[in-house]
């Protein structure tokens, strides 16, 4: 089974179990060293604690065992964790919550010969992102159509 199919199956199975105040941010599955790792990224307002991740792990693990047929080709380690400072912005809702924050955006197609922008998200209306970024020493604004965004995440401003 392809890794993207595993991620889709896992996401569909665990989403109903991750309820308010928690938010499912992302699911990743892949090899880390010699082991397969299923990473479930979860967050909540004010941040997630170690106890939260332990409780969610106990809730999620039995759900994964009910997926039939078993989508995992090999044994894997389950990791329930915080998305960290550079959390991915995978949905339009996540992008909307990031208005006013410093973000990193990769595009499918270039705008003004650039495919990567890093700056402050000024607004998002569901269709277009408006960002302010530094071009050498000058501040510039760019309008990015949402459908051209390949990846977006929060970024740490240095």
Curated annotation (Swiss-Prot):
Biological function: Required for maturation of 30S ribosomal subunits.
GO process terms (BP): ribosomal small subunit assembly; translation
Family: Belongs to the RimP family.
Any one GO cellular component localisation term in the record: cytosol
InterPro entries membership: Ribosome_maturation_RimP, RimP_C, RimP_C_sf, RimP_N, RimP_N_sf
Organism: Streptococcus suis (strain 05ZYH33)
Protein name as it appears in the record: Ribosome maturation factor RimP
NCBIfam families listed in its UniProt record: PRK00092.1-2 (NF000928)
Keywords annotated in UniProt: Cytoplasm, Ribosome biogenesis
Domain of life: Bacteria
SUPFAM superfamilies (UniProt xref): YhbC-like, C-terminal domain, YhbC-like, N-terminal domain
Keyword Cytoplasm: yes
UniProt-annotated location(s): Cytoplasm
